[in-house]
Amino acid sequence: AHAAGALLLMDNPWATALLFRPFEHGVDIVIEAATKYIGGHADVMLGTITVSTAEQFQTVKWTANALGNCPGPDDCYLALRGLRTLSVRLERHQRNANVLARWLRERDEVGRVLYPALPDDPGHELWKRDFKGASGLFGVVLNAYPKKAVAKMLDGMELFAMGASWGGYESLMIPTHPGKNRTATKWRGPGPSLRLHAGLEDPDDMIEDLEKGLARLTKAS
């Protein structure tokens, strides 16, 4: 990007600045959904833009002023509240995600687990080189199951709610369709894909919920 005279912008909600330092890797502008891990309680709608130079800050400030972008004081208060516990929550999210990811990859119903903190993940070496940790968000590719079976699995989950905005204290699970979004490479997966967010609940309770869900998946196939 820099060789072509362009600025490099990065979206960094998965790791946050605690687990990945974009400016140390040549990034110029960092955006992040503060709705997710910064807020941490699924009760705020907020985004952040962080820049590396004073000149960029003036440009962003002028643009925000011209567009009338102004977060409410309550939203800012909730984000500041979340920042106080961010490091503690991320540590728990990572620990729970590791437990779930390792458990899921041993299941016969699962074809692949997409989580760079796993030693056998294709991106593990890059993650280990550049990141200081992992968060609670990861993907699961099931083996070949019909949509009705996946729906049956999801409908009966108790701890894992269905929700798009991850990063809060609760665990979430939704179906995903990576094949529809790929442009550079073709998606190859043995079956349906799920996106999981490991919340702050007890991992044993989450595993019990997943085990029952996978049983429904198999029974409905």
Q: Model-found features: residue ranges?
A:
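Conserved PLP-enzyme active-site core in the AAT-like
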Residues: 1-109, 114
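Active-site-proximal loop/turn and secondary-structure-junction residues that shape catalytic pockets
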Residues: 14-16, 119, 170
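Hydrophobic side chains in well-ordered alpha-helices
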Residues: 60, 149-153, 206-210
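A common structural junction motif
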Residues: 67-68, 155-165, 213-221
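Short, well-ordered beta-strand elements within core beta-sheets of diverse protein domains
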Residues: 79-88, 135-144, 194-199
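Conserved small-domain helix->loop->beta segment predominantly found in fold-type I
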Residues: 98-158, 164-167, 178-188
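PLP-dependent enzyme catalytic core of the Aspartate aminotransferase-like
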Residues: 144, 171-221
